[in-house]
Amino acid sequence: MKLTQLETPEQRIEALEKIVQPFKERAATYDEEGSFPFENFNDLKQSGYPALTVPKKYGGVGISLYEMIRHQETIAIADGSTALSIGWHVGITKHLGETNGWQEEMYAAFATDVVNRGALLNNASTERATGSPTRGGKPETCAKKVDNGWIINGRKTFTTMVPILDYFVVTASIDGTNQVGSFLIERTNDGVSIEETWDSIAMKATGSHDLVLTNAKLKRDHLVAYLKPGHKPAAGWLLHIPACYLGIAKAAQQYAIHFATTYSPSSIQGTISEIPAVQQKLGEMELRKLQCEHFLYSVAKKWDETSEDIRQTMKPELSAVKLSVVNQSIEIVDLAMRIVGARSLSKKNPLQRYYRDVRAGLHNPPMDDMTLSSLATKSIQEHR
């Protein structure tokens, strides 16, 4: 039975836990090869996972933000790269469906494609010259208006999930104006190509290669939105990012607990889990995990239960969740490695992969310095 046919969040979470079990077994191979986990995505598509955040009126399930991050965490425990990748699709799909960000006809066609065949989408915004889109740089990718539509030229970096994407949402400066637009480009468009540039030591299986657009021709209605560089409304869907890194931390914690409760060197009686120094680290991991869960889950539920006006005041809060959970997750993985010791650095040990992958969270948006600045501004305004 597909996830989309199950009635409750609990049923879907339990079913997904079973679906992703093979992901854990495949993760080391994909990481070592730096190859894309097509098998994982085929399993997710077969389960109907890409359609969970499609609104009900288009044939999806329209799950809550809280349920979405629980699912993302579950996938990340099995494989962080797969979780981060699919998280962009389910998050953006949810956001567009809730905000009516595109014309009805355009979103309906996309949503139907997701429901019928598991079509996948991601934003393509980052460029080498402009850096992170969150800092407001104007894209060098250019869209030129022609009689029957648009011609787009440019290159986007860090296009996560690009080996399997069906749709790209590309930011481009509109030629002859000061405007920036968001354009929907299908993979089958002429002028669309991929250059395999992804050589990161973290999240190696995300396939975050370059998207190259060479005289890509689009219909006029594929300009789906106008953007204001640097202006980012509150986006609850971005909580898929901290959910992913918390999942990686939980995988590391589970490994460390298993090791501590089964490893019994000849120098002691019992296992190392009974040694006070190890118990301190186990306790600290659990404390940090609980703090992450409560912060992440409570803010997600607040988003689900509040009005759009209140949601737009939550930007500092959402950013704080990302900063806190990612940094706490890094500490959890570090503690796990201290418990396991030097063997955690073995190429065969999953902890070394968790260590590399969890640090990638520092470079996902929003950046820590911008979050702290926004929190400072918030505290000053509230003091007045």
Walk through the language-model features, giving the residues of each.
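Basic/polar N-terminal segments that are highly enriched at the extreme N-terminus
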Residues: 1-14, 18, 384
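Amphipathic alpha-helices that form helix-helix packing interfaces
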Residues: 242, 249, 256, 285, ...
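C-terminal helix-coil-helix/basic helical segment that borders enzyme active sites and/or dimer interfaces
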Residues: 24, 28-31, 290-324, 337-340, ...
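A short core secondary-structure module
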Residues: 155-192
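Glycine-rich flavin
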Residues: 36-46, 51-153, 160
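Glycine-rich phosphate/pyrophosphate-binding beta-alpha loops
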Residues: 158-161, 237-240, 364
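Glycine-rich phosphate/cofactor-binding loops in nucleotide/flavin-utilizing enzymes
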Residues: 340-384
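Glycine-rich beta->alpha junctions and the first turn(s) of the following alpha-helix
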Residues: 200-289
